[in-house]
């Protein structure tokens, strides 16, 4: 009952999120629960924390990917980090991505594409706007493209 009150306070903007720092697996179990065990406000607070964690991860991985791109012209580490993140998501969140998401990431890694030289140093061919494509998918994608655009716009390489 206390947790429900805290979640209600959070939903009304007068308290901290009681689920802050909880694992993605636990958050998904609450946010997507339809058994009636959790209140709407608890489910909302859990979803909000998962969203906040996802956005923090996206900001970090985009910054790392930008550094990789600036230094090497490649995005292999970025794609590998995205694939690792995807594989670590709860199954209910993975299900919200396209069926071929993991294989597409693996393919992009195998391309070993050098964006500075504009050529694949591995096998296969290139895809346009791969970062935007990736970040427009998934359960928390709404702001993904906006984050990618602001991250690349605010870097020296983008000017």
How would you name each of these model-derived features?
Residues 1-159:
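Type III/flagellar secretion export determinants
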């Amino acid at each position: 009952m206390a947790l429900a009150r805290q979640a209600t306070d959070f939903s009304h903007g007068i308290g901290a999120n009681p689920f802050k720092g909880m694992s993605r697996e636990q958050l998904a179990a609450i946010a997507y629960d339809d058994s009636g065990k959790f209140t709407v406000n608890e489910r909302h607070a859990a979803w909000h924390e998962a969203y906040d964690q996802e956005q923090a991860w996206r900001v970090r991985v985009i910054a790392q990917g930008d550094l990789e791109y600036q230094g090497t012209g490649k995005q292999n580490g970025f794609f590998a980090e995205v694939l690792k993140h995807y594989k670590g998501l709860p199954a209910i969140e993975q299900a919200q991505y396209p069926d071929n998401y993991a294989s597409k990431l693996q393919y992009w890694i195998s391309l070993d594409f050098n964006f500075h030289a504009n050529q694949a140093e591995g096998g296969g061919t290139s895809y346009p706007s791969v970062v935007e494509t990736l970040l427009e998918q998934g359960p928390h994608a709404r702001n993904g493209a906006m984050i990618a655009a602001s991250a690349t716009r605010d870097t020296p390489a983008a000017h």
